[in-house]
Amino acid sequence: MNLDAHAKTLDNHGYKESRMNACGYSLGSTFSPTWMDVPPMIFTGNPLIIKPGMVFFTHMILMDSKNQLAMNLGETYLITENGNERLGKQKLDLVVL
């Protein structure tokens, strides 16, 4: 697993101070002490090998600690023999209010 591309993209657009050091986690049964333990989190240096049948929620969190605001966008994917399958059914069209 690799967070570098995610981090580099956000850093290059001025969000280095706002991003987290992980960008998703596995879904399914995990055991104590918590679901936040390694290897479920997606971060640089994680030794987990992604295999068909695994499900991941990949997300981007941007935080503004000064104003106590946060934003999160994410998608759930099933890993398949040929890549991945997006499990969300919502449209990906840009909505401008």
Where are these regions (language model features)?
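Active-site cores enriched in adjacent His and Asp/Glu residues with nearby glycine-rich loops
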Residues: 1-33, 49
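Charged, cofactor-coupling segments
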Residues: 22, 29-97
